[in-house]
Amino acid sequence: QGLPLIDDNIYLRVKYHFNKKAAYAFAARFYLYYTQPDFSNCQKVINYANIVLGNNASQYLRDWAALGALSPNKNIQPNAYVDADNRANLLVISAASYWPLVSDPGYANCERYCMNNITASESCKSEGPWGDQSSYHQIPFSPGGSIKNGFRRLVIYQQFTSGNSWIGYMLYPAFTTDEALLCRAEAYTLLKRYDEAAADIDAWQKAFTKNTQTLTKETINDFYARLKYYTPEAPTVKK
């Protein structure tokens, strides 16, 4: 009942406040997690995601090709990822945090907080119906000779207090159009509306990867039918 009361016109910079599209994206996420035995929650996920994405979701997804073309240093890609002017970012929040420092694979402190070669092989470096990691527009970053892997998406901002002492801050896109699309795809899947789910996954993979093959429920089923189940010695995404 509170969603229609949100007024974007009262904000100077809408993306830094709980705006209307962010609220509907939150509702889509909430109802996806609030699973009912009969999956009656899923239609609400679809309805709220539709408000966020409109009739053509692809035009609102992140431009992953543009992001991947930027330098993967500690600032350029992460700053572009959290940019409030990016069409995919619906709500950008700030926090006093050192998380970008400990989670980025380029920092020495992150060994316990980012992917290693084994966990990366079943996540950011895994193979999907769109191909392997070489098909991604944004390639997972790994320092030379290191087992650390991950995407560079967060940057630490420093507020110096005195001398060399400083407080760390971060910006984080709490809700994005890409997530809203994937929430809708999962809701379609739970409702056994597989063609619509595959269409959403296809829209996402064409934004995130270089693959131009259209994904269908048949091609997705064929890929995962051939994939071996996970074992500790040979991890995969199929559990």
Regions found by a protein language model. Name each.
Residues Q1-C183, L190-D200:
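Structured, solvent-exposed acidic/aromatic patches
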Residues D38, Q213, Y230-A234:
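Intrinsic-disorder-associated interaction segments
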Residues R87, R193, K217, K238-K239:
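Surface-exposed charge patches in extracellular/virion surface proteins
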Residues S165, I201, L215, K238-K239:
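Helical anchoring/docking segments at protein termini
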Residues E186, T209-T214, K228:
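Glycine-centered secondary-structure boundary/capping sites
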Residues E196-N211, E218-D222:
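Active/binding-pocket-proximal capping segment
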Residues T219, F223-K239:
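C-terminal non-catalytic interaction modules
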